[in-house]
């Protein structure tokens, strides 16, 4: 199957999304109502924040999370999703091991070509039905509808009994374990019909790009259930959902309900501007937004600690290479990399939490020493600020300059628009500075902020000139996931789900100094094999190809500046030096994990 699937947030993955109405009121949050018995009779509440769209734009189709989800699902693109529909396990980034949730164990048999997951017994859904292996099969077949990358490895699915799932594969994939264990499991009662339709296509040898697959994909994008059947310790209190906040209430029969310590989780809706005021007023206990550097001292004065976990990703400059032939010329992209001062962009966006990308290989600088040999690192071009090189490359590509202004190879005035999610304070500041730097160089770029839910959709449809979207991935340390974000999520393979080509960089028959390559194949191979040394070779090929071609231009690597309010309503946030702080906040979130452990608790008294 060709690798065609849809985003995040990230990651996404990788980032924050919302559509906050112009009239949102965030300065006076409503007091949450009680939703549980509590130890002392009074309900306890944790106050978090995450951007979402209320109905009708927002919905409860939690399918194919976290790697190929449907856009605008309420809380579906963030860490609190795991408290509603838990995955099999969460990954401990420092310890490099799994902490099981729904799963009891797992085993990868390379010679037999199977990944077997044993499910904890006696798990139940909020509708009263048992959670079984059939729900896992449904989940994976629904991922096929969303063109999830896992289906480049999966060759079959089996459920020998109610608590055993077997995933079959051909080439042992290093990353399949992550795709399987991190999948948020869906209820067959809610998604069984969709899973059956996908299974029929799989068994017939079909794809999502033809016949029944195309119709199924179209139908599924329109599936917007009124609620979600959950298996985790919390469920939505649907009556509380407004444009400003919602409440999650304890699901007493869900997995982890015996360990989580809060009766309610109050989630305030909003992007950075709205949530900043709520942090300053002490209404939020923890938030992961990209806060403006100027906010940090007021937060600390209000009693907050600033947590700075690595995010392992950040914003990149996307160029519409399908629409503008000058952007399709690698010399132009290299010139842009040389002319942009990435350190300044990161400093303006996030101060010490915005670190300029150094190696420009498509994945976090934190992992370069783990995956690339000294020989490979010696081949990397770091694209350090060099306006002379930028000028030379543009001239070589046919650009000309009249006075202080550049013209494209076609003789047109070099004038573009860069779009970015307006409500992301860090990306907004970065986008404006990118426009200023281009202007100082003689290329006119107009900055335009968009609704942050619409911005990635516009990129997928090709309705942009320049744009800020994510590079890298918070989903797992393995570089494969970063390459998927860089090359597939807003490019031809996955943008297809929105009917476009994204930034329009072809992945097949790509010319490099090493010869003609198939980047889609290279990315897939970067996740194959169980021998680490073999994986390093594949990762090196992908890293060098990215570094030479710069399909997108990474700008800075983001570190969290997450305010945590210890000792008022909540206690148990990790301290500096705690290895759990190496967990990516948008993937295996340390606060969510500590909630499952019962280590984030209400303040007594």
Regions found by a protein language model. Name each.
Residues 92-93, 185-257, 264, 387, ...:
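Gly/Pro-rich hinge or "lid" segments in bacterial periplasmic/extracellular proteins
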Residues 49-110, 141, 229:
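N-terminal lobe/hinge region of extracytoplasmic solute-binding protein
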Residues 120, 248-298, 444-446, 451:
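Ligand-site clamp/hinge motif
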Residues 47-49, 132-138, 162-168, 233, ...:
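Alpha-helical secondary-structure segments
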Residues 42-55, 104, 114-117, 139, ...:
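Short, well-ordered beta-strand elements
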Residues 5, 10-26, 37-42, 46-47, ...:
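Detector for C-terminal structural segments
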Residues 104-147, 160-168, 326-328:
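Aromatic- and charge-enriched surface segment that lines or borders ligand/interaction sites
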Residues 151-213:
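Surface-exposed binding/hinge segments that line
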């Amino acid at each position: 199957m060709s690798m065609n699937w849809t985003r995040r947030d990230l990651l996404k993955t990788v980032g924050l999304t919302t559509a906050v109405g112009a009239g949102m009121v965030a300065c006076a949050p409503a007091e949450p109502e009680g939703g549980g018995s509590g130890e002392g009779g009074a309900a306890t509440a944790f106050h978090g924040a995450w951007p979402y769209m209320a109905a009708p734009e927002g919905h409860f189709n939690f399918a194919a999370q976290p790697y190929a989800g449907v856009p605008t699902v309420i809380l579906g693109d963030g860490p609190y999703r795991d408290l509603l529909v838990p995955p099999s396990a969460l990954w401990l980034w420092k310890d490099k091991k799994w902490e099981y949730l729904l799963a009891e164990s797992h085993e990868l048999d390379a010679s037999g070509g199977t990944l077997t997951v044993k499910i904890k017994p006696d798990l139940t859904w909020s509708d009263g039905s048992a959670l079984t292996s059939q729900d896992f099969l449904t989940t994976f077949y629904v991922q096929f509808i969303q063109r999830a990358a896992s289906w480049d490895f999966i060759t079959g699915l089996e459920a020998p009994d109610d608590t055993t799932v077997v995933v079959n594969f051909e080439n042992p994939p290093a990353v399949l374990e992550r795709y399987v264990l991190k999948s948020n499991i869906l209820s067959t009662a809610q998604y069984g019909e969709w899973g059956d339709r996908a299974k029929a296509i799989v068994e017939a040898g079909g794809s999502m790009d033809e016949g029944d697959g195309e119709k199924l994909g179209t139908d599924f994008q329109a599936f917007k259930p009124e609620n979600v059947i959950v298996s985790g310790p919390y469920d939505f209190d649907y009556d509380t959902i407004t444009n400003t906040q919602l409440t999650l209430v304890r699901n007493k029969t869900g997995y982890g309900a015996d360990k989580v310590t809060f009766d309610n989780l109050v989630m305030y809706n909003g992007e950075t501007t709205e949530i900043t005021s709520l942090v300053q007023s002490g209404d939020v206990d923890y938030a992961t937004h990209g806060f403006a550097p100027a906010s940090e001292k007021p937060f600390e004065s209000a009693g907050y600690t600033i947590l700075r976990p690595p995010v392992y990703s950040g914003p990149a400059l996307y160029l519409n290479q399908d629409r503008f032939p000058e952007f399709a010329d690698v010399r132009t992209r290299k010139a842009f990399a040389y002319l942009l001062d990435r350190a300044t962009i990161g400093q303006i966006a996030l101060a010490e939490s915005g670190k300029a990308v150094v190696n420009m290989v498509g994945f976090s600088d934190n992992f370069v020493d783990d995956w690339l040999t000294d020989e490979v690192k010696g081949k990397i071009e770091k694209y350090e600020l060099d306006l002379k090189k930028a000028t030379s490359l543009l001239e070589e590509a046919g650009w000309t300059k009249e006075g202080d202004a550049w013209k494209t190879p076609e003789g047109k005035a070099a004038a573009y628009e860069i779009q970015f999610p307006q409500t992301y304070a860090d990306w907004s500041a970065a986008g404006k500075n990118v426009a200023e730097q281009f202007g100082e160089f003689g290329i006119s770029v107009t900055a335009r902020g968009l609704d942050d839910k619409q911005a990635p959709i516009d990129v997928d449809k090709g309705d942009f000139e320049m744009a800020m979207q994510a590079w890298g991935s918070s989903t797992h340390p393995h570089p494969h996931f970063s390459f998927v974000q860089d090359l597939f999520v807003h490019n031809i393979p996955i943008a297809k789900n929105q009917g476009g080509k994204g930034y329009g960089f072809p992945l097949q028959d790509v010319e490099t100094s090493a010869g003609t390559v198939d980047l889609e194949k290279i990315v897939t191979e970067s996740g194959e094999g169980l021998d680490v040394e073999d994986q390093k070779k594949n990762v090196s090929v992908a890293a060098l190809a990215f570094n030479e071609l710069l399909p997108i231009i990474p700008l800075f690597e983001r570190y969290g500046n997450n305010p945590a309010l210890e000792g008022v309503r909540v206690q148990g946030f990790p301290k500096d030096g705690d290895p759990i702080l190496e967990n990516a906040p948008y993937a295996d979130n340390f606060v969510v994990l500590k909630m499952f452990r019962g280590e984030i608790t209400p303040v007594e008294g």
